[in-house]
Amino acid sequence: KLVDKSYQLVSLKDIGTPDQEIALLVEEISNRPEFKKIMGQAAEDLTRKEDVASLMTDAMRDAVGGDFAFYNKGGVRLNELRKGEITMEKIYKMEPFSNYIVVHEWNLNKMEDFILKDYNRGKDPGKRYINYYISGGKYEIIRNLQGEGIEVKFYDARGKWLKDKQKKYKIAFSNYVASSNELVKGGEVTDIFITNAIAVYLQ
């Protein structure tokens, strides 16, 4: 039985010397051979978060043979990837949550509903933003004069505007999105961790 609780916000910038015991533990784990294993090579610098997200979502889509993949913006934790070796450590820095892939079969109407409901969450139009990266194509949000999203146009990888509202597409999501978004609940749960999907995709 919980009888009391208390908490205190601590600014990380105010922390001076890190705890020595924890620092040694982090160093020990970081130096494990499995984290140093080279899974692939980056032919050039990926200098934008969007580029790193493209790698992640391409790997998700490829892992399930999907048409599209979506991944939330806040889940991409590596903002850039420099040219050269890509180790498992870097992959875990991209996606440190042990998320796995959940698959849905959706038509364009369901995809549009998914994007618009998320985009229109914020009441202040000036603070609305696109939250989901996509692989397999691109999408465009059409807004009214009040800044509210009213339509989404989806395009395939060749830039063709997709207009068949009844055709279903195989779409990969992370289990985080599937558990936190009412529209994405359910679906086919796979045993494919996103980190493993990235590692396989790079090889």
PLM regions and their residue ranges:
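Catalytic centers of hydrolytic enzymes
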Residues: K1-Q203
